[in-house]
């Protein structure tokens, strides 16, 4: 029992080898600056406890030794709480006019697709409805190509 009491425990190993962990440690070949004399704190031996995992140990890297670790409150940080912005509902059962014109284009032979392409090119639309209008403009181009190829399909040049 005397031999075990004489051996140092894992948590009380030489405190000179435990380094301060911070975000900036400085350059290895440049000595750390000493704090001004009015801010010098007396060096107390750092005692460690085996059950506590997070301790603020100050080694050769310097730094501020807080009593309970790192500070919890960040100074000069204001929290601004605002009400959430409420957007209006989209027309046509929440789909928006763009997707409504896209669906109606299948029923009315592509004319609503040209209307949707005209709207997206000329006016400023809601960002939520823009996908439907872009789908209308793509469908109008595909419809135009299909009609042109369909019209030339009956002519035999060969």
UniProtKB/Swiss-Prot annotation:
The keyword DNA damage does not apply. This is Large ribosomal subunit protein eL20z. Belongs to the eukaryotic ribosomal protein eL20 family. The gene is RPL18A1. The keyword Ribosomal protein applies. Keywords: Ribonucleoprotein, Ribosomal protein. The lineage of its organism: Eukaryota, Viridiplantae, Streptophyta, Embryophyta, Tracheophyta. One of its GO terms (cellular component) is ribonucleoprotein complex.
